């Protein structure tokens, strides 16, 4: 009886050729049902599991399943199960996966060590740059009653120089980071001259 139900179901499903004919006759937008039927027709092949030949319609009461049916999830589960069995039985694949996991762990450990080193140097007071000490000195002068009106031109020049140096350093670091990623910063005027 089970075989007669399967044969009946198989006979009522459209073949790939019939779907193509329907699709060629209709010149307007492709229906999602056509894709659905093509998928069903593609999956209509028999799947051998545990020595038996079974069909995925066996557990379905309707001829064509609706969106709430487990047909799609069953298909995904079968694929996942096959891949898992393939990896577990093949010792070469197991070795490759094991090596890949070890490499990832080593990279994570190296990255954590580098972050710790960077934090140590950044937080130590001996590694402060001269630029920040000059700016701190200028701020100290304003605290002790020396306003910007009383600042000499030499001090103003020093502060503007340090500010421009900071901007240059930041731009260089930004450009270096972009170059590492394969990007290049080009002035807009240079680009417009190239296009024109």
From Swiss-Prot:
Keywords in alphabetical order: Kinase, Transferase
Function text: Involved in the regulation of plant growth.
The protein's name: Vascular-related unknown protein 2
Compositional bias segments (type: Acidic residues): 103-121
Domain of life: Eukaryota
Annotated GO MF terms: kinase activity
Region listing for Disordered, in residue ranges: 84-130
Extra remark beyond the main annotation: Plants overexpressing VUP2 exhibit severe dwarfism.
GO biological process, one term: xylem development
């Amino acid at each position: 009886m089970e075989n007669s139900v399967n044969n009946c179901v198989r006979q009522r499903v459209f073949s790939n050729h019939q779907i193509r004919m329907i699709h060629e006759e209709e010149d307007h937008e492709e229906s999602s049902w056509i894709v659905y039927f093509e998928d069903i027709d593609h999956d209509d092949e028999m799947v051998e599991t545990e020595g038996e030949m079974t069909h995925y319609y066996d557990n379905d009461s309707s001829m064509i399943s609706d969106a709430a049916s487990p047909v799609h999830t069953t298909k995904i589960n079968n694929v996942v199960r096959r891949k898992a069995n393939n990896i577990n039985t093949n010792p070469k694949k197991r070795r490759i996966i094991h090596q890949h996991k070890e490499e990832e762990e080593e990279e994570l450990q190296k990255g954590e060590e580098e972050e710790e080193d960077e934090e140590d140097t950044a937080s130590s007071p001996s590694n402060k740059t001269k630029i920040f000490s000059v700016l701190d000195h200028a701020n100290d002068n304003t605290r002790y009653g020396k306003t910007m009106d009383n600042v000499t031109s030499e001090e103003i020049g020093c502060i503007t120089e340090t500010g421009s140096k900071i901007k240059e350093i930041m731009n260089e670091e930004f450009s270096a980071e972009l170059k590492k990623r394969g990007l290049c910063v080009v002035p807009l005027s240079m680009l417009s001259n190239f296009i024109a």
